[in-house]
Amino acid sequence: IIFIFLLVIFSPQAGAQIWQSDVPAAQTSTTQNDSGPVAVPIASEKALSYYKTRNFWWGFGIIWGLFVPALFLFTGWSAKIRDVAQRLGKKWFFVIGLYSIIFTLITFLIDLPIGYLSDYSMEHSFGLSNQTIGKWLQDNFISLAISCIMGFLFLWVPYLLLKKSPQRWWLYTSILAVPFIFLMILVQPLWIDPLFNKFGPMQDKALETKILALAEKSGIAGSRVFEVAKSEDTKKVNAYVT
């Protein structure tokens, strides 16, 4: 893990050195419909710094995500949370649900400062965010609520499979995870995304017509286009498709 972490940190700089040594001025590329080469500008120092910083936090997040559960397990905190959940709940599935909520709340508080540094502070330091601290906290608390609800409703399933089939519970859990993932793909744009963004009709009707025509040409009939004032949060995203 440490090797991978160090590799992630230093690989952007190594890549930048190779890039800058191999490309004297600008890269060129062509596409099928281009009449000539298209110049690709060399990444700026700021872009390379952002890339390196983002990868640092990505690697740190992997290690942190392993460290925190291990800390709960080996310090006995997990057992204490279990005891509290058992006092509050009678049935085993309620105990698991309550444990999930308590664990999620504690880890949320532990992770919040890290999230502030790796997300809110970093994006603002590179001038890529318009998000206020209030909106950032609001989004995090919404994510917390969703995590608590999902954990309470569904975490008991793998434990039930573990009780019924100690040898193959992991296989059955994996099989059940497939339809669950597809369900979440359908649910997210309808009920979860609107919790973070305000969707409305597209103001530029001419652009909407072009987008719908392109979708129909691609075999996607009956599409709808919505507009979100995402510039309130970020300067990086201008559109996405779901």
Regions found by a protein language model. Name each.
Residues F3-I4, A14:
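Cleavable N-terminal signal peptides
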Residues Q17-F74, A79-T242:
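Polar-ligand-bearing catalytic/cofactor-coordination segments
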